[in-house]
Swiss-Prot record:
Family as reported in the entry's similarity comment: Belongs to the UreE family.
UniProt GO BP: protein folding; protein-containing complex assembly; urea metabolic process
Protein name: Urease accessory protein UreE
UniProt keyword Cytoplasm present: yes
Organism name: Corynebacterium urealyticum (strain ATCC 43042 / DSM 7109)
GO cellular component, one term: cytoplasm
Pfam families: UreE_C, UreE_N
Main location, first listed in the record: cytoplasm
Assigned keywords, A-Z: Chaperone, Cytoplasm, Nickel
Length: 158
């Protein structure tokens, strides 16, 4: 089976609608979310190929890859090892963000209305970043999180 489009997201379906299907999940780590062409296996050992158009920038948790009268195949994003930085104030955040930005690291930002309940910067785990956060006495925690967007390798040139 070759999948060439995303049909929607399971978040758009009610629990009653989902219950009408046998659901198989394709469990993907962060790095695989940005691969448009890949071979994957569902949790029921069904092998499928993905050949997604360039308009699809990344897969999201709950994306529907296949749907018929009885079967639903969806994406389940695996938790990512991340550092959640909780700035004490704007000055500290600016200094830390500037230092980490010089390393061309991808970061995701969340506000008080997010699941974090406060303003945070989330970075994919890296021991050198953790060392830096310790060195500047930043408030942070290391967590496993399902991220709403994939972390991408940052391309750059000077």
């Amino acid at each position: 089976m070759i999948i060439t489009e995303i049909l929607g997201n399971r978040a758009q379906l009610s629990a009653d609608e989902i219950a009408q299907y046998t659901e198989e999940k394709v469990k993907l780590p962060n790095l695989d979310l940005v691969k448009r062409i890949q071979r994957v296996t569902t949790d029921a050992d069904r092998e499928i190929g993905l050949r997604l158009p360039s308009e699809v920038k990344e897969l999201k948790d709950g994306d529907i890859l296949y749907q018929n009268d009885s079967l639903l195949i969806t994406v389940e994003v695996l938790p990512t090892d991340v550092l959640v930085y909780r700035p004490r104030n704007t000055l500290e955040m600016g200094k830390v963000a500037h230092s980490l930005g010089n390393r061309h690291l991808q970061a995701q930002f969340f506000g008080e209305d997010s699941e974090y309940g406060e303003t945070v910067m989330v970075l994919q785990y890296d021991h050198t970043v953790e060392d830096h956060l310790k060195h500047v006495d930043a408030q942070y925690s290391r967590e496993d999180r399902v991220m709403p967007e994939a972390f991408r390798h940052a391309e750059h040139s000077h």
